[in-house]
């Protein structure tokens, strides 16, 4: 029988990836389309991806597919062709190629079936997810940014917005996409007569959000084709000014792609200009936060003196303290209190 799940330890896989000599290309893509049998599709696609040495994170649901992966450079075109011929709905699918890439974004292939490819919390049976807003290409985005009648809405989470966003874009303060959707409707009521432009990292969240806004009575709704990644790529290729400021947070080991030279965030410990996310080195914490090199040295990669002290304890004592603890895996959020329960590297489907 074919192998449909990874059977090698994470440590072994990571060491193997780091020892690879061939460069890898980090790619993200998504597609909203009907999948009649997500589990069957998942198993078939897993075999295709495994044969091409693809690593990464892939979600499938009845509503489509959402993927962030890395592919050996010599196999990118083969991957593209096999993906396009796997299902007619995937033929010609746009692949977002990473803007900054060291090829070390993933080291294992995880492919899961979920209820939704993005957790939206929508349970309204009358909602039509296909009734989306109009696409905007790079040149159109820059025109809209200069339009006083347009309002840009960032459909990413607070830790993403903190390190980079479009000029004057509104933040919808929330920890998850499902929390953002009702807040966006509420916050934008006063802008109902404006042109609403929504964006996210690669397009998947803002596409669904645009449909949700239209469902709630907003008529002038656009979203950026391919999200921040494709916008920056096209703007650079066409010699256009790149109007995104700062860094684009990404959901893999890189944790960010530099878009502009500006550093708009600050170290969460000392306040110095910094936009580098990290996870607290204390395995009982793993807080996602921004830390400058000086504080990383001072606190040994930890988020606090308490975690620094705990990290210095014997491993057995650290394990004892971690046992049954419920306050690990958190994200720093200045807008809603210091700690909020989450994954170390947040789940892009949330």
UniProtKB/Swiss-Prot annotation:
Pfam assignment, any one: Rhodanese
Bias type Basic and acidic residues, positions: 319-328
Superkingdom classification of source: Bacteria
Keywords (A to Z) from UniProt: Oxidoreductase, tRNA processing
One example GO MF annotation: oxidoreductase activity, acting on paired donors, with incorporation or reduction of molecular oxygen
Main EC class the enzyme belongs to: oxidoreductase
EC number: 1.14.-.-
Catalytic reaction(s) noted: uridine(34) in tRNA + AH2 + O2 = 5-hydroxyuridine(34) in tRNA + A + H2O
Database matches in SMART domains: RHOD
GO biological process terms, semicolon-separated: tRNA modification
Signal peptide: none
Family of this protein: Belongs to the TrhO family.
Function (record text): Catalyzes oxygen-dependent 5-hydroxyuridine (ho5U) modification at position 34 in tRNAs.
Full protein name: tRNA uridine(34) hydroxylase
């Amino acid at each position: 029988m074919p192998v449909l799940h990874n059977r090698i330890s994470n440590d072994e896989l990571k060491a193997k990836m780091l020892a690879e000599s061939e460069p890898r290309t980090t790619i993200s893509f998504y597609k909203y389309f009907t999948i009649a049998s997500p589990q069957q599709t998942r198993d078939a696609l897993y075999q295709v991806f495994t044969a091409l040495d693809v690593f990464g994170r892939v979600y499938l649901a009845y509503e489509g597919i959402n993927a962030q992966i890395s592919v050996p450079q010599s196999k990118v075109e083969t991957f593209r062709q096999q993906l396009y011929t796997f299902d007619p709905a995937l033929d010609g699918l746009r692949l977002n190629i990473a803007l900054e890439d060291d090829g070390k974004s993933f080291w294992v292939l995880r492919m899961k079936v979920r209820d939704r490819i993005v957790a939206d919390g929508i349970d309204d049976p009358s909602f039509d997810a296909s009734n989306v807003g109009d696409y905007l290409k790079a040149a159109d985005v820059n025109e809209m940014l200069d339009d006083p009648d347009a309002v840009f809405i960032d459909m990413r989470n607070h830790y993403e917005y903190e390190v980079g966003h479009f000029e004057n874009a509104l933040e919808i303060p929330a920890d998850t996409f499902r929390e953002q959707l009702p807040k966006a409707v509420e916050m934008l009521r006063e802008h109902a007569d404006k042109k609403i432009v929504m964006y996210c990292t690669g397009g998947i969240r803002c596409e669904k959000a645009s449909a949700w806004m239209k469902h709630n009575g907003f008529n002038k709704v656009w979203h950026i084709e391919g999200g921040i990644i494709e916008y920056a790529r096209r703007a650079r290729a066409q010699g256009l000014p790149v109007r995104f400021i700062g860094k684009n947070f990404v959901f893999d080991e890189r944790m960010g792609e530099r878009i502009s030279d500006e550093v708009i965030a600050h170290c969460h410990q000392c306040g110095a200009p910094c936009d580098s996310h990290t996870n607290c080195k204390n395995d009982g914490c793993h807080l996602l936060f921004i830390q400058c090199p000086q504080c990383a040295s001072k606190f040994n990669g930890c988020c606090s003196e308490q975690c620094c002290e705990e990290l210095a304890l014997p491993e057995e004592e650290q394990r004892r303290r971690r046992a049954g603890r419920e306050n690990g895996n958190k994200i720093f959020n200045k807008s809603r209190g210091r700690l909020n329960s989450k994954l170390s590297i947040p789940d892009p489907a949330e």
